[in-house]
Design a protein with these regions (language model features):
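Trp/Phe/Arg-rich N-terminal binding region typifying the photolyase-homology
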Residues: 60-72, 85-133, 145
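Basic, amphipathic alpha-helical segments enriched in Lys/Arg and hydrophobic/aromatic residues
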Residues: 279-286, 299, 420-500
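Alpha-helical support elements that line or immediately flank enzyme active sites
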Residues: 76-86
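Active-site- or DNA-interface-adjacent structural scaffold in DNA-acting proteins
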Residues: 108, 112-316
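Electropositive, glycine- and tryptophan-enriched low-complexity nucleic-acid-binding patches
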Residues: 318, 326-372
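Charged, often Cys/His-bearing segments associated with DNA-binding zinc-finger transcription factors
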Residues: 1-51, 55, 477-500
Length: 500
């Protein structure tokens, strides 16, 4: 049984519209909760969001029968809080069980002893999909535009840029990736054998240490700084020998894992869980086979491995090696994300870029943003988004395209880029860096979720969270100004000075 929100209040429960926040607080939690309060108290917005959540998360779940699950509202609140605070599920678990104001937002009163389990939070927040979050984001941005008193006829002026969201991986080398693959292959196989009462892998911990020992030996052979030709040649032969030993040990255990899987398969897989286990182990074995081949080609045969063949994490295979040329940041491991922000500091659209460059997503970003917000007619970019096709295509979509060209400019291009409207929009473009910094502070520095689907969900939730936080910040400032006016109006001395 899952409902959008419990209609019957309990003793001690505070209505969400009546929740009060400390105006002196400078923490992030009150502002994002103020934004969530706005979402809940705006009846048309709340109804539309609940309809989306109900249709995507629990379309066939009974609302009257069965064990109660987390409400749709609580799922959304927990997801937003996790991203806004850039925290893991352990901290979220602590907050939802012991933070009084947050529990009021979740619908729990002072006498309500309901608590949430760690796995409950993890399973339910993961039900949010990127497509669902994108639909909710459109509703939130439209409500935000009403809040800032945007005229229905007012045009939207966008600014577009990309940045890297890192995946949670260690720095990759071919030999440590091979160790990762061997460690998981041996460990998972040993656990399975232990459950089946098979003694093939009684010494699995020693086996893993042996693989690691040979890997460390191969790593240490790289550290020689000898300059004598004979010593260099000798060190090179020792390096090759150490790597060959490492490969031989890895291959021997890889063969043993394969034999064990064959034995278990011949005995018969009992259920679907066993099939999933077998597929998982075979996946790590495939990673190990690839790394053995690449190490052999690079170290022993002296071949340069093409970049397209390299994998930078066996746990997050979608990870890319990105070098944007930033000072002090030679390389970033993750995926690029492109965002488009309007003049009111709301993020209209975003895109996760897989094996794509800025100029390849320029047109799609504008087209998709205009589908969601037809009033968008101006957009600025940096030079990385430039191409001849983009210059032509964007002029069909927008009234003003602020896309600086690369290289020497023609006379016509110079006139375009020196126009007053172009210069004004280009100067305002740097404000998008503030949005990027806000996203990185509130979750998008490193993705904590697993897999490409988890990555997309994490980014979409961060964008929605940022827009809700923006609404909360606007309301927070309005509340402060309102209280300041009340205070001035109530003070007779101030009134007399103003009258004078």
């Amino acid at each position: 049984m899952r409902v959008a929100q419990n209609e019957q209040m309990t003793i001690g429960e505070v209505d969400i519209s009546k929740i009060r926040f400390d105006p002196k607080s400078r923490d992030d939690i009150p502002k994002v909760l103020r934004g969530l309060q706005f979402v809940y108290t705006n009846l048309p917005l709340r109804t539309s969001i609940f309809e989306l959540l109900d249709a995507k998360i629990s379309p066939k779940v009974s609302k009257t029968n069965g064990r109660p699950g987390m409400t749709l509202w609580n799922i959304l609140v927990c997801g937003v809080i996790r991203l806004d605070l850039n925290c893991d599920y352990d901290r979220l678990h602590e907050l939802v069980n012991h933070h009084n104001t947050l529990r009021e937002m979740l619908g729990h009163g002072a006498f309500d002893e309901v608590t949430y389990h760690f796995q409950t939070l993890k399973d339910n927040v993961s039900l949010l999909t990127p497509e669902l979050l994108d639909d909710i984001n459109i509703l939130v941005v439209n409500a935000g535009h009403v809040l800032v008193k945007k005229s229905p006829d007012e045009a939207l002026r966008g600014r577009c840029d990309s940045f890297v969201v890192e995946t949670h991986v260690h720095f990759p080398t071919d030999i440590n990736l091979l160790f990762d693959a061997m460690r998981k292959s041996i460990t998972l196989t040993a656990q399975w054998c232990e459950e089946l009462r098979m003694s093939d892998w009684r010494q699995w911990a020693y086996n893993v240490r042996q693989v690691k020992r040979t890997m460390r030996t191969a790593q240490n052979k790289k550290r020689s700084k000898a300059k004598d030709e004979k010593q260099v040649a000798k060190n090179q032969s020792l390096l090759i020998e150490a790597h060959q030993t490492y490969l031989n040990v890895a291959q021997s255990y890889l063969d043993k894992v394969g034999q064990t899987l064959t034995t278990i398969t011949e005995q018969g897989l009992s259920d679907a869980i066993d099939l999933v286990r077998k597929i998982e182990i075979e996946g790590f074995m495939a990673h190990a086979v690839r790394q053995i081949d690449q190490i052999k080609r690079r170290v022993i045969q002296g071949e340069d491995i093409p970049h397209a063949e390299k994998v930078f994490s066996i746990f997050q295979p979608h990870t890319e090696w990105i070098s944007k040329g930033k000072a002090g940041v030679p390389v970033e491991l993750g995926l690029k994300v492109c965002i488009l922000e309007d003049q009111h500091q709301f993020i209209l659209h975003h895109m996760v870029m897989q094996q794509q460059t800025d100029d390849q997503v320029t047109q799609e970003m504008v087209i998709e943003a205009k589908k969601r917000f037809p009033k968008l007619n101006v957009c600025s970019f940096d030079k990385g988004f430039h191409s001849k096709d983009n210059q032509v295509a964007l002029k069909e979509q927008l009234e003003l395209v602020v896309l600086p060209r690369k290289g020497k400019l023609s006379k016509q291009a110079q006139e375009e880029e020196q126009a007053q409207a172009f210069v004004k929009a280009r100067r305002a473009h740097s404000s998008v860096e503030s949005a990027i910094n806000g996203l990185e502070v509130h979750g998008l520095d490193v993705c904590r979720d697993h897999g490409i689907e988890g990555f997309k969900r994490y980014v979409a939730l961060a964008v929605l969270t940022r827009n809700i936080h923006r609404i909360g910040a606007i309301l927070w400032q309005q509340d402060i100004e309102r209280e300041h006016r009340k205070k001035n109006h109530a003070d007779p001395d101030i009134r007399r000075r103003l009258a004078a």
